[in-house]
Amino acid sequence: MDTLDKLIELAQITGSVDIQCLFRDKWYAPHGRRRAHGIAHLVVAGESYIKIEGEPEARRLKAGDLIFFPRSAEHILSSEAACNNCGDTIHISNDGAFTIESSGSGGEKSLDLFCARFEYDEHADIMHDLPETVLISMDHPSLQCLVSMLQYESAHTLSGSRAIVNALSSVLLVLIVRAYLEQGGEAPLGGILNGLRDKRLRQLIQTVVSRPEDEWNIEKMTALANLSRAQLMRLFKQQTGISPHAFVNLIRLRQAAVLLRQTADSVLSVALNVGFQSETHFGKAFKKQYGISPGQYRKNEAADTAALPFSYDI
């Protein structure tokens, strides 16, 4: 498992690409901000205007564009450049594994797109390290293949279709992040992802993410990074926003959160498995990071699982 795989696992992400928008004539589709949710729009055909919260002017989306909001920034999709035609409503229906959102009748579609949604642990580092808006092109063969699969599933009512579109969301997220990271130094990043971009820190970060339970002292970390203590402390803080020791502690807690929700291991066992020396120390560190005790975090999983399905504000 590489570092991107691990960060996605620690984020505890679930999702689906189960909404298809087929818009004609005039239409208006607002999307509100939701905590611990991400949204992606994949433009298959046509074009649209999109007004994003905090931006003075609407952007234009065209066929082949993919726009991703890791933290579901508030935005409006519209047929009009002003994005203020709120009287033009959207009709919603179900067709197999997909929810179909449509407008108008007859004529060519002015916009054909798929919407993906992602839900994740609200502390998910990978989703907070990305910028508010990620815009990439779907000209990569892997993304083209994924869109073709979505189009096929939406055009045919086949058994197991829902499982396929749910699984494709995981593939889509990896492809989005991978494509964005491949843009290089011009792509704004924060936290762990920004640290990974620095060759001097990459090996250290990758090793800690893969083995947080190891004993991590400053001597071991400086040796792995081939930096002096002062250099490591300064560079790590500069690139990630936290100290090396805080980073180790953070990854241990993220791994613990996964174990608390996915296993029945005791809190003590979880603490020891991720590198803490005592349940007391672990409990204090966990509550400082998550605001609740490890036991309460585990209990909250049942409430999260029973939460209402995701829906757009249309």
Q: How would you name each of these model-derived features?
A:
Residues T14, I39-L42, S142, L146, ...:
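Amphipathic, well-ordered alpha-helical segments in soluble domains
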Residues L4-L10, E74-Q151, E182-Q183:
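A hydrophobic/aromatic-rich effector-binding and dimerization subdomain
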Residues M1-F68, S72-G104, P309-D313:
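Generic protein-terminus/edge-of-domain signal
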Residues G283:
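DNA-recognition helix of C2H2 zinc fingers
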Residues Q203-S210, E215-S228, R234-T280, Q289-I292, ...:
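Terminal helix-turn-helix DNA-binding modules in bacterial transcription factors
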Residues G46, E80, E153-H156, A179, ...:
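Generic structural signal for alpha-helix termini and adjacent loop/cap motifs
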Residues M127-Q144, S154-S169, L173-D214, I218-A225, ...:
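Short, Lys/Arg-enriched, Trp-marked, Pro/Gly-tolerant hinge/linker segments that flank
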